[in-house]
Amino acid sequence: MKEININVEHLTRVEGHGNIVMNAKNGKVEKVMWEVSEAPRLFEAFVRGKPYHQLARITSRICGICSIGHTLASLKATEAAMDIEISEQSQLLRRLAIHGENMQSHILHLGYLISPDLFGTGSVVPLVRTHTDAVLAVVKLHRLANEFSEVVCGRTTHPTNLIPGGFYKTPSPLKLQEYRQKLLDSVETANLVAGIILDNAGALPDFTRETEFIALTAKDEYALYDGLIGSTDAGTYPVDEYVSVVNEFVVPQSTAKYCKNKREAFMVGALARLNLNYDHLSPLAKQWAEKFGLKPVCHNPFMNNVAQLVEFVHSIEDSVSLIDRLLEDYKDEPRPEITPKAGRGVGAVDVPRGILFHEYVYDSDGNCARANCVIPTNQNHNNIQHDFEAFAPTLLDKPEKEIELNMEMLVRAYDPCISCSTHFLNVEWKR
């Protein structure tokens, strides 16, 4: 039997740096490993001693793609710690904000990073010539998502309108009405992109490994902004109990922590959300899920990309509904007045890559005494490793380059944000 040695350093078409190592001999996998080599980011240390109104601004910089999600998780943690209530209008606007980010991130990942795998090219660049209409459709949807996020959040990345207690400046009702129509008009383009992905979905490997899925879940909505922690294995947990759910631990090959709950690992992200919130998908989103044969509980991690597509359509439709609700009684609300106080708070939102937790402890002056952030990709690393261990033995009869591509595709299916996940370093000095 042939000997296989794969060493992919700095996997491409993902955010950050990760390596794939695989060695096989005599028809047996001797070693397979997902290595995270990114340098730690230390954001929990950055925010210590900082006043409450600065934390969302700082922590949004954890990620340029998920800056809105980090801002919202940060604000929710601060508001929980200080017993700050926000208006129904602000809650609806924040739901719009997270839809904007979902659309931004999902179309970026599907259109630029995953499509080359579906069409057998090394990057999206050759597709500009061979599939011009498809690439232009992706660019059109990406531009709309960016513009929509700017209208709601003040700018496309690192939002300025989202502040503790509400909004710095509420979006213009005329702008909301304008983008309501643009969202409706985008459905045709979204259907075009979905149809192209459906036609090429045969390129996604048919691989399943049973695992636990964790996401926000709610009784009356497809949970992104609010809800309980849901598990396909263990029901629901209060957000405050997130530490006992994620159970972080360290491994030698990773600068990011691993997580586990009821099994050896769990998965977060679009597929986890769909598995737990399927019944609350919008009508067109559910139609596309059915066309792809995607229904709960799906254990194929490659279908995470299909779930992202379904969520993109859901975000369009639900955003239109949210705008309709907002415009029924829209107000130019004043900026909230906040009196700092001591307290602990946890904020959770489900961002494009999965459930995100921020926890802060404040002193009586409103300065941060302690912070903890648990990032979605950090929760997925362990599941990627266990998928590797199950997937690699099924590939041994393939050429080495094809094995390498399949392993790379598996990581890309998770849409990892690797540099976000290497967020914590604890150094204990002994003299």
Regions found by a protein language model. Give the residues of each.
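Active-site bordering "gate/hinge" segments
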Residues: M1-I355, I375-R431
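A translation/RNA-centric and nucleic-acid-associated enzymatic feature enriched
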Residues: R353, H358-Y360, R370
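Active-site catalytic microenvironments in core metabolic enzymes, especially phosphate/sugar-handling
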Residues: G366
